[in-house]
């Protein structure tokens, strides 16, 4: 009996950890660094932040300080890659932000301003999202030297507002920029950059989804002044075949499986586990997505 209970407890723990995803590793140059070596470790496992007024929107729950996190040196203009524990599977945009620390990145809480340097939005026609296990972007070459928080977020809008609540999956890396220029981009405060009335926050990806505006400011580039986010409009149909990837159907789970809180437990086409772990229930958010809450 004790053995069976241990197996059940382990199964539930694995389910909890795999319910969502987290950006946990950074690559710079040709080196893939250790898990949470240069990324602040959060305290909510891989669960999302949903409160638009929370300071946790900056660097996730438990990410206000980086005292136990190292800071990596990178050159302005160089590329970097964020890696996840499991590929992003909630539809929605992925964005990267920078915020310059007044001193060391490790002691900075992100209360200054943030500017966006990259968006991965949907492509049209079809509304296909970039659902990947890693995301590579480039630092602007013109920004000033110093220490920064490098923030990545995946905004899950798979559970349309207002029946559901969009989910922010966030991580912050600590970097020291060298070889830069003289530009200090203007930015936005977080929280405050995202509002419940933003079209990209309230979008319903299951109904008349033909264009999309990524929440937050526009992407900064050297020589630009920034501004509001630009909408992603439908593009002419390509003459070549566009190969896209979708999440593979989830295999039917064995009897006794349990979905962790915030995980998917049903919906049209869902073939996975439909039983929620103790303490949560399966709630119908829409025809396509049922969630343990």
Curated annotation (Swiss-Prot):
Regulation: Glucose dehydrogenase and aryl-alcohol quinone oxidoreductases regulate the oxidative degradation of cellulose since they can act as catalytically efficient electron donors for LPMO9E.
Keywords carried by this UniProt record: Carbohydrate metabolism, Cellulose degradation, Copper, Disulfide bond, Metal-binding, Monooxygenase, Oxidoreductase, Polysaccharide degradation, Secreted, Signal
Enzyme type, top EC level: oxidoreductase
Cofactor requirements of the protein: Cu(2+)
The protein's Enzyme Commission number: 1.14.99.56
Positions of the CBM1 domain: 257-293
GO biological process: one example: cellulose catabolic process
One Pfam family of this chain: CBM_1
Cofactor note: Binds 1 copper ion per subunit.
Domain of life where this protein originates: Eukaryota
Subcellular localization: Secreted
Protein name from the UniProt record: AA9 family lytic polysaccharide monooxygenase E
Source organism per UniProt: Podospora anserina (strain S / ATCC MYA-4624 / DSM 980 / FGSC 10383) (Pleurage anserina)
């Amino acid at each position: 009996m004790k053995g069976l209970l241990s197996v059940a407890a382990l199964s539930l723990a694995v389910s909890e950890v795999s319910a969502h995803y987290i950006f946990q590793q950074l690559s710079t140059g040709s080196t893939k660094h250790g898990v949470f070596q240069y990324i602040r470790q959060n305290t909510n496992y891989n669960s999302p932040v949903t409160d638009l007024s929370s300071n946790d929107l900056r660097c996730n729950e438990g990410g206000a300080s980086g005292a136990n996190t190292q800071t990596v040196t990178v050159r302005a203009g160089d590329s970097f890659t964020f890696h996840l524990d499991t590929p992003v599977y909630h539809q929605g945009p992925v964005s990267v932000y920078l915020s310059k620390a007044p001193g060391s990145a490790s002691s900075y809480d992100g209360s200054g301003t943030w500017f966006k340097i990259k968006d991965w939005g949907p492509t049209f026609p079809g509304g296909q999202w970039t659902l990947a296990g890693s995301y590579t972007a480039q630092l602007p070459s013109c920004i000033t030297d110093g220490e920064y928080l490098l923030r990545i977020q995946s905004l899950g809008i798979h559970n349309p507002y207002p029946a559901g609540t969009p989910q922010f999956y966030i991580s912050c890396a600590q970097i020291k920029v060298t070889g830069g220029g003289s530009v200090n981009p203007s930015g936005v405060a977080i929280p405050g950059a995202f509002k419940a009335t933003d079209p990209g926050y309230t979008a319903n990806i299951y109904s008349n989804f033909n264009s999309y505006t990524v929440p937050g400011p526009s992407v900064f580039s050297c020589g630009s002044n920034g501004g509001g986010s630009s909408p992603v409009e439908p593009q002419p149909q390509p003459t070549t075949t566009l190969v896209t990837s979708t999440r593979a159907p989830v295999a039917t789970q064995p009897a006794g499986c349990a979905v962790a809180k915030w995980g998917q437990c049903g919906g049209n086409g869902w073939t996975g586990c439909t039983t929620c772990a103790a303490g949560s229930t399966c709630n119908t958010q829409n025809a396509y997505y049922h969630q343990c809450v």
